[in-house]
Amino acid sequence: MNKLKITQIKSSIGCLKKHKSTLYGLGLRHIGHTVIRQNSPRLLGMINSISYLVKIKD
């Protein structure tokens, strides 16, 4: 499986509580924070729901 590099590019202030929970579930805490995760269908679903807050690199 590939790894994805996920970076938070927008603030979570004013977002839905569900989207904030998704950010924390991915391990993102603040703007500019980057995490590396294994690519999986579950992860892609999480990213899809908060696509306006994050940037993805393969």
Curated annotation (Swiss-Prot):
The keyword Nucleotide-binding does not apply. The keyword Ribosomal protein applies. Coiled coil: none annotated. Keywords: Ribonucleoprotein, Ribosomal protein. One of its GO terms (cellular component) is cytosolic large ribosomal subunit. HAMAP family: Ribosomal_uL30_B. This is Large ribosomal subunit protein uL30. It comes from Wigglesworthia glossinidia brevipalpis.
